[in-house]
Regions:
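Generic start-of-chain signal for non-secretory N-termini
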Residues: 1-30, 108-113, 126-164
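Conserved nucleotidyltransferase catalytic core and NTase-mimicking acidic/glycine-rich helix/loop elements
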Residues: 164-243
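Helical scaffold of the NTase/Pol beta-like nucleotidyltransferase catalytic core
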Residues: 1-66
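Short acidic (Asp/Glu) and glycine-rich catalytic loops that position anionic groups and cofactors
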Residues: 17-19, 85-86, 117-119, 134-137, ...
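Short, well-ordered alpha-helical packing segments
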Residues: 86-89, 103-114, 202-205, 232-242
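Active-site nucleotide-donor binding segment shared across nucleotidyl transfer reactions
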Residues: 43, 47-95, 100
Length: 243
C-alpha cells in the first residue's frame, strides 16, 4: 500500500513539473502558486512518512516534536520553477521519539521523487549553537507542516537569535553588495553575472525583514508606495526571466 502511495506521489509531482508553466499566465503571481503547490507536495510526503513509521497508530502532528519550515526565497513565496526548495527540518530530541531515521526517510522520499531541495536539519536545543551563516537562513521562515506547538517555541528562539545577532547578520548580507562600491556611473546591470539581479533583491528583502519592527514594510521608511510597487514588479520580472 505504501509503495503504491509513493508511486502516485512521484507521478503527481512529475505531472505537475511538466505542466507548471501554465502558472506564468497568473499575471505575475506564478511564484506564489508554485510555492503553494510545493507546500502541498511536501505535506503529502510527510503524510507518507508518518504512515510508514506509525502505521495506524500515528499521534496528532502537534504531538510529534518535529516540523518543516520553508526558508529563504521559498519562505517568501518567491521561488523560481528551476530553483531548489530551501527547507529547515527542526526536531526536539526526546527519548520517546527516535526522529532522525524518520527525517532521513522524509528526505529520501523527496529526493527519490526528483524534488530539488536544499535542506538543513536542526535540533531545537542546538539552535543557538549553529553558525552565523546557517542562522541567516532563519531570517525568513514559514511553517509548512508538523507540530505547531514546537513551531511556536521555535519562533521565540528565532526571534531571540535574530535580535542578538542582528548586526552580525546584517554584515553578512551586506557582503553581497560589494560590487556596488564602485562609482554609480560605472555600474552596469548584468543579469548573467547577477549584478543588480535576483540575488541582490533577495539580500535586500532579508535586510528589510531583519530590521522590521512593525507590520509595515520596512522599505517604506526609505521609499514610497509607488516605488515599492515598482520594485515588486521588477522582482516578478526577474523571477519569470530566471524561470
Amino acid at each position: 500500500m505504501l509503495n503504491k502511495e509513493l508511486e502516485i506521489f512521484k507521478k503527481n509531482l512529475s505531472s505537475y513539473t511538466q505542466s507548471c508553466r501554465k502558472f506564468f499566465l497568473k499575471q505575475g503571481a506564478f511564484s506564489l502558486y508554485h510555492s503553494k503547490n510545493m507546500d502541498n507536495f511536501i505535506k503529502k510526503a510527510y503524510d507518507i512518512v508518518l504512515k510508514d513509521y506509525f502505521d495506524d497508530f500515528s499521534p496528532p502532528s502537534d504531538n510529534i516534536p518535529f516540523c518543516v519550515l520553508a526558508s529563504k526565497a521559498y519562505a517568501n513565496n518567491s521561488l523560481c520553477f528551476n530553483e531548489s526548495i530551501s527547507l529547515i527540518f527542526v526536531y526536539k530530541d526526546i527519548k520517546a521519539f527516535h526522529l532522525k531515521p524518520m527525517i532521513k526517510a522524509f528526505i529520501e522520499i523527496l529526493n527519490d521523487a526528483h524534488l530539488q531541495i536544499d535542506s538543513v536539519i536542526l535540533e531545537f536545543n542546538g539552535l543557538y549553537n549553529a553558525s552565523n551563516e546557517l542562522k541567516t537562513s532563519i531570517i525568513q521562515t514559514r511553517f509548512i507542516c508538523g507540530s505547531r506547538i514546537l513551531f511556536k517555541r521555535i519562533k521565540i528562539k528565532f526571534e531571540s537569535i535574530l535580535k542578538e545577532n542582528k548586526n552580525d547578520f546584517a554584515k553578512l548580507l551586506l557582503e553581497n553588495f560589494k560590487e556596488f562600491d564602485i562609482p554609480f556611473i560605472k555600474q552596469e546591470f548584468n543579469i548573467l553575472k547577477d549584478f543588480g539581479g535576483l540575488n541582490h533583491l533577495r539580500s535586500l528583502e532579508s535586510l528589510l525583514v531583519l530590521f522590521k519592527t512593525s507590520p509595515k514594510n520596512y522599505a517604506l521608511n526609505f521609499i514610497d508606495e509607488k516605488n515599492l510597487s515598482e520594485l515588486r514588479l521588477a522582482g516578478d520580472f526577474l523571477l519569470s526571466l530566471k524561470s
